[in-house]
Amino acid sequence: MEKIIIQTKRRTEFVDITGEIERILKSKNVKSGICYIFVPHTTCGLTINENADPSVRKDIIEKLEQLVPENDKYSHTEGNADAHIKSSIVGHSLTVFIENNSLQLGTWQGIYLCEFDGPRTRNVWLKILP
């Protein structure tokens, strides 16, 4: 298993981790396989989305905030109940095909760590299977 450590800077942000995953993948020299990506946290998640236009990430963050406002009434009173819900909506794992030692993503796709309770130190775990 490989690990990436990300230090987030804001309470809510999407951090592009595609390049870091690709660098690890290149060191493994996997011609064909699967990359399983997982975050062991309950207040952040992972997603694949457009990496060319930052307004897409901004729109997603704004809509999630409308759906699950930070300061709504929640039973969980630690001050981050919304982050738990948002991370459940987004999800905690991704699976991406590998061909010719490269992630098989669409032209405009990137892999994002979705922070909902930052700033924090986050771990991303990778399992690369040939």
Indicate where each model-derived feature is located.
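Active-site histidine-anchored catalytic micro-motif
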Residues: 1-130
